[in-house]
């Protein structure tokens, strides 16, 4: 199990619109990928401009097997709403 932890800077005035567009493009795309488990969107408790995407994958290999061309197509579909996140990756050591 691997967790992809992305942090986006999103203007609070644009948050709801951005979340809807992000869900329409990125969430629907990810749901179709082999190895995708789950995705949640979190707002930082101490900074309302920070939105965190927590994405669970069955394995790093499945996550990294997504073709770059497919990722590029989603970026293009997001248009001006695409945001470059900071990213961290976590590997599961123990469950429970």
What is the predicted function of each stretch?
Residues 2-9, 38-68:
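Short, well-ordered beta-strand segments in beta-rich or mixed alpha/beta enzyme
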Residues 14-37, 70-75:
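Short amphipathic alpha-helical segments
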Residues 14-16, 61-63, 95:
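Residue-level signal for secondary-structure boundary sites
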Residues 2, 38-49, 74-96:
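Glycine-rich beta-strand-turn "strand-cap" elements at beta-sheet edges
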